């Protein structure tokens, strides 16, 4: 596989996680996942920005992206069942990684929406890759590539969402 092809398939593989991670800003709102509960430090577990609607909506959107991908490139997945499993695990893993990041940010007393460089851009990716590993994985070179480019994609997507009025801050 040539390097350009390898880059394309790395993006294709991770696309459900990218969509899942970006979707809650559009479909979120409603009841917070933590239900308003606080940790031993007196701060919220996750905060108002992490909602059930955003989490479930993000997982569904990411999974649907994977299903659409299957119908475009069925050979990449081998079967619809594999595509659904992989897309679900990438999406679920991405949002679990985002929740873990929010938990860590609350412990560090960072306010909602405040940037945490590295954690915001890579936590979702690392978690998505870990969750999806049992179904299908990438080469180490592809993973390194995604670790390098994902922060830039994340920053660009957040800036776009800010300019569109979907986010109140550009990070």
Curated annotation (Swiss-Prot):
Metabolic or biological pathway: Membrane lipid metabolism; glycerophospholipid metabolism
Catalysed reaction, written as an equation: 2,3-bis-O-(geranylgeranyl)-sn-glycerol 1-phosphate + CTP + H(+) = CDP-2,3-bis-O-(geranylgeranyl)-sn-glycerol + diphosphate
Keywords noted in UniProt: Cell membrane, Lipid biosynthesis, Lipid metabolism, Magnesium, Membrane, Phospholipid biosynthesis, Phospholipid metabolism, Transferase, Transmembrane, Transmembrane helix
GO cellular component annotations of the record: plasma membrane
Leading EC class: transferase
Membrane-crossing segments per the record: 7-27, 54-74, 84-104, 115-135, 141-161
Cysteine-cysteine disulfides: none
Superkingdom, natural source: Archaea
Listed EC numbers: 2.7.7.67
Keyword Cytoplasm attributed: no
Topology with respect to the bilayer: Multi-pass membrane protein
Gene Ontology BP annotations: glycerophospholipid biosynthetic process
Cofactor(s) required for function per UniProt: Mg(2+)
Principal location listed in the UniProt entry: membrane
UniProt subcellular location: Cell membrane
GO MF entries: CDP-2,3-bis-(O-geranylgeranyl)-sn-glycerol synthase activity
Record's function text: Catalyzes the formation of CDP-2,3-bis-(O-geranylgeranyl)-sn-glycerol (CDP-archaeol) from 2,3-bis-(O-geranylgeranyl)-sn-glycerol 1-phosphate (DGGGP) and CTP. This reaction is the third ether-bond-formation step in the biosynthesis of archaeal membrane lipids.
NCBIfam families: PRK04032.1
Protein family according to the UniProt entry: Belongs to the CDP-archaeol synthase family.
This protein's name: CDP-archaeol synthase
Gene from which this protein is expressed: carS
């Amino acid at each position: 596989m040539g390097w350009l092809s390898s880059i394309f398939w790395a993006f294709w593989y991770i696309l459900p996680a990218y969509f899942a991670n970006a979707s809650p800003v559009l479909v979120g709102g409603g009841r917070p996942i933590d239900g308003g509960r606080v940790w031993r430090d007196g701060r919220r577990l996750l905060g108002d920005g992490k909602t059930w609607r955003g989490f479930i909506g993000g997982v569904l959107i990411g999974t649907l992206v994977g299903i659409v991908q299957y119908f475009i490139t069925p050979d990449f997945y081998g079967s619809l069942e594999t595509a659904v499993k992989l897309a679900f695990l990438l999406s679920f893993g991405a949002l679990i990684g985002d929740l873990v990041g929010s938990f860590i940010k609350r412990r560090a007393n960072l306010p909602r929406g405040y940037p945490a460089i590295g954690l915001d851009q890579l936590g979702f990716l690392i978690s998505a890759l870990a969750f999806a590993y049992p179904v299908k994985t990438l080469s180490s070179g592809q993973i390194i590539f995604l670790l390098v480019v994902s922060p830039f994609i994340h920053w660009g997507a957040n800036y776009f969402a800010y300019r569109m009025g979907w986010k109140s801050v550009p990070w």
